[in-house]
């Protein structure tokens, strides 16, 4: 097979249906909209209106709410931190906090804090100032000789 022999699969490309172009076309006159009624008229359709049938947003019960006080944390794995250290983006002399992670390009946007997760391995001794760290992440950091601090202001 050569590049000039390539073609689309049968039925992959279909001609668009041109409606309202004469009765011989099969979709002339009413153009597939039926006869009369709100949905046959021109203009925008009503969002959520199902032709008089009880709409889905009223058939289903209300559920849950948006917690205004919920904290949105940046989740960072130890593997990503180790790769940033290996490439020289992260300085291990200073404690790692949310600003250091932002400058290293590990997180894009500063949120309410940092959540350390244990995915990957940490090979160097390093100190962290973070909002939260999983138990497994804490154990891996302490095994490598590092420390985890949870400042009140973070």
From Swiss-Prot:
GO terms for molecular function: rRNA binding; structural constituent of ribosome. The keyword RNA-binding applies. GO terms for biological process: translation. Keywords: Ribonucleoprotein, Ribosomal protein, RNA-binding, rRNA-binding. GO terms for cellular component: cytosolic large ribosomal subunit. Belongs to the universal ribosomal protein uL15 family. Part of the 50S ribosomal subunit. This is Large ribosomal subunit protein uL15.
